[in-house]
From Swiss-Prot:
<comment type="function">
    <text>IGPS catalyzes the conversion of PRFAR and glutamine to IGP, AICAR and glutamate. The HisF subunit catalyzes the cyclization activity that produces IGP and AICAR from PRFAR using the ammonia provided by the HisH subunit.</text>
</comment>
<dbReference type="Pfam" id="PF00977">
    <property type="entry name" value="His_biosynth"/>
</dbReference>
<keyword id="KW-0368">Histidine biosynthesis</keyword>
<keyword id="KW-0456">Lyase</keyword>
<comment type="subunit">
    <text>Heterodimer of HisH and HisF.</text>
</comment>
<dbReference type="InterPro" id="IPR013785">
    <property type="entry name" value="Aldolase_TIM"/>
</dbReference>
<comment type="pathway">
    <text>Amino-acid biosynthesis; L-histidine biosynthesis; L-histidine from 5-phospho-alpha-D-ribose 1-diphosphate: step 5/9.</text>
</comment>
<dbReference type="InterPro" id="IPR004651">
    <property type="entry name" value="HisF"/>
</dbReference>
<dbReference type="GO" id="GO:0000105">
    <property type="term" value="P:L-histidine biosynthetic process"/>
</dbReference>
<dbReference type="InterPro" id="IPR011060">
    <property type="entry name" value="RibuloseP-bd_barrel"/>
</dbReference>
<protein>
    <recommendedName>
        <fullName>Imidazole glycerol phosphate synthase subunit HisF</fullName>
        <ecNumber>4.3.2.10</ecNumber>
    </recommendedName>
</protein>
<comment type="similarity">
    <text>Belongs to the HisA/HisF family.</text>
</comment>
<dbReference type="GO" id="GO:0016829">
    <property type="term" value="F:lyase activity"/>
</dbReference>
<dbReference type="GO" id="GO:0005737">
    <property type="term" value="C:cytoplasm"/>
</dbReference>
<dbReference type="InterPro" id="IPR050064">
    <property type="entry name" value="IGPS_HisA/HisF"/>
</dbReference>
<keyword id="KW-0963">Cytoplasm</keyword>
<dbReference type="GO" id="GO:0000107">
    <property type="term" value="F:imidazoleglycerol-phosphate synthase activity"/>
</dbReference>
Length: 251
């Protein structure tokens, strides 16, 4: 059985790690490099670096920051934010990223997924899917959650899989930063409908929430920020907790 992964996420804005609630109310969560070093030493399985204002403000991810982080960590690094072309993806890879995450640009131009996958392999393409429950439907949003799209979550997940995505990073906007647990209903819906890995995101506030994301949500990996950034729990502690409850993790 493949080991479940624990992935801390660095949401970066103006050169600092930040964390908000429901994609709003950002507060400072420390230095990018200090957090990256910490997670590298904490046995994180991977690290995600998201420039959360890049697409919204039509800025490009700061390559210098990516280069610094990639020089500090020896675990797979996924970089997202403002990646809207194969050429931009190439620059990010050349600065040390192992994977790129696309979101807004993929919705605007779905063929971008295929083009990056054809050049670098599906394993290097993560499609970030931000969803919000409207009525009884999970609607995909773009531009840092500001703009609803025509896509429902499952429809878009199946489409990105067909286009060559290697993973889906599924974030519940309703749960983001709330520490109320992942939206395991939407997680299970997507995880059981696609054959590529699904990363749970949005809402982790306890070690039990990580466990639930794997068991109830059927996720392949759990992404978290608040509980790790502010040292509520360590990744080592989280992995031991999961291991003790029968979840296969890398210790």
């Amino acid at each position: 059985m493949l080991a479940k992964r624990i992935i801390p996420c660095l949401d970066v804005r103006d050169g600092r790690v930040v964390k908000g609630i429901n994609f709003e109310g950002l507060r400072d969560a420390g230095s990018i490099l200090e957090q990256a070093r910490f997670y590298n030493n904490e046995l994180a399985d991977e690290l995600v670096f998201l420039d959360i204002s890049a697409s919204l403000e039509s800025r490009k991810t700061t390559l210098e920051e990516v280069l610094k982080v990639s020089g500090e960590v020896f675990i797979p690094l996924t970089v997202g934010g403002g990646i809207n072309s194969v050429e931009r993806a190439k620059e990010v890879f050349l600065h040390g990223a192992d994977k790129v995450s696309v979101n807004t640009a993929a919705v605007n131009n779905p063929e971008l997924i295929s083009r990056i996958a054809e050049k670098y392999g599906s394993q290097a393409v993560v499609v970030a899917v931000d969803i919000k429950k409207i009525g009884d439907r999970y609607i995909v949003h773009t531009h840092s959650g500001k703009q609803p799209t025509e896509y429902e979550a499952l429809e878009w997940a199946l489409k990105v899989q067909e286009l060559g995505a290697g993973e889906i990073l599924l974030t519940s906007m309703d749960r983001d930063g709330t520490k109320e647990g992942y939206d395991n209903e939407s997680l299970a819906l997507i995880s059981t409908s696609v054959h590529i890995p699904v990363i749970a995101s949005g809402g982790a506030g306890s070690l039990e929430h990580l466990y639930d994301g794997f068991t109830k949500g059927r996720a392949d990996a759990a992404l978290a920020a608040s509980i790790f950034h502010f040292r509520q729990h360590s990744i080592r502690e989280a992995k031991q907790y999961l291991h003790d409850r029968g979840i296969t993790v890398r210790l």
